[in-house]
């Protein structure tokens, strides 16, 4: 509840968010995540150190980060989920911004975390098993809907153009090659 009270009002006001999962040596194998989370008993915070890659909205204000909280583990049971308030200081370095074909309004970044303070979301060891899997399933639905919407809009644009564009005295939709494509 404390995390909700702190971050949800900011999200409602327009602060951006990111889900920082992928790493250079892990790729889609999230059980191989190595970004290290170390707990500091003095201030009650966790500190994150390591690299994330291909992070959509990598420069976001609020970051949800999957990190290895359990020393000596090498599977999903050693991962926890953290929320980071990105102060846009030198502790999170945007090392690279990908040059993408589309969706340029959302930077895809490589990030270096340098002892970044974070708060644990939920329970330790459930980062991948419970929290990330739940978020990813929702994200997959959103990506599917976005893809259907974009392809439908592209088709409708092409169809309207083919009906309006005239060549050799007729709409190009009447040419068999164009008609077959649409």
Task: Write out the residue ranges for each language-model feature.
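Alpha-helical interface subdomain recognition
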Residues: 13-14, 29-30, 40-42, 112, ...
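Short beta-strand elements
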Residues: 32-39, 66-67, 111, 115
